Amino acid sequence: MTDAYTVLAGRYDRLTSDVDYGKWADYAQRHFAKLKRPVRSVLELGCGTGSLTKLLAERGYAMTAVDLSPDMLTVAEQKCRGLDVRLLCQDMSRLRLPDQVDAVVSGLDSVNYVTRPASLRRTFRRVCDVLSPGGLFLFDVKTPAALEGADGQTYLDEDDDLFCVWRADYYPRRRVCAYGLDLFVREEDGSWSRGGEYHEEYAYTMEELDSFLREAGFRNIKMYGDKVMRAPKEGAQRVFFAARKEL
């Protein structure tokens, strides 16, 4: 198995073609509109191939996008060429920016990929540091119910020249859902090449996340259902957090 997203990077957009980034951008803007001042600069944490960053840049925001994978950022660079986008290869828990931003967004359960609570607490502190006073931090997470429910599941994606198999295993003692991925790609000569990756996501409780945010200096912390402006339902698979840095 190779490092996460080394194999996936060039095929990630095809494998996530069902993700509605436009809806995510719309949702972010609904939260921006609730602030008492305009949002001009936005940071995306865990930007991947830059799909959300590109949309927000096209809507007029000065974007900074951070990801740990150089391969994903290479795709993002091509996608965002000509737009007001700054791309940085950084570990979220060691986040540093030359200037503050008005809002930070993080989607597609990037927070779950920080598998050590101490690292996530440090990440939240760094996010608070780079936000201007009163700034917004908006992110989503898979809930423990979602990760526990994935145990033993197999996921398939395929088309004419791509075949991908995911296997999920949940480990209760570690509170981690591990994904083993096998990717088969048809080459130009008709032969097939195979690659593999290993991913882990941590099952944070909503109470833990709320506590980490408060510890980092955030206030007015609210939870929402999946891209809706109301509280999540019991047993929700995905929850959004919106938190503000103190003025």
Predicted regions span which residues?
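SAM-dependent methyltransferase
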Residues: 138-210
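Conserved class I S-adenosyl-L-methionine
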Residues: 1-46
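Class I SAM-dependent methyltransferase SAM/SAH-binding core
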Residues: 51-94
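A short acidic, Gly/Pro-enriched loop at the edge of an enzyme's catalytic core
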Residues: 96-103
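Residues lining the SAM
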Residues: 107-109
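C-terminal lobe and adjacent flexible extensions of AdoMet/dcAdoMet transferase-like proteins
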Residues: 202-247
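A short glycine-rich, Lys/Arg-flanked "PGG" loop and its adjoining helix->strand segment in the class I
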Residues: 121-133
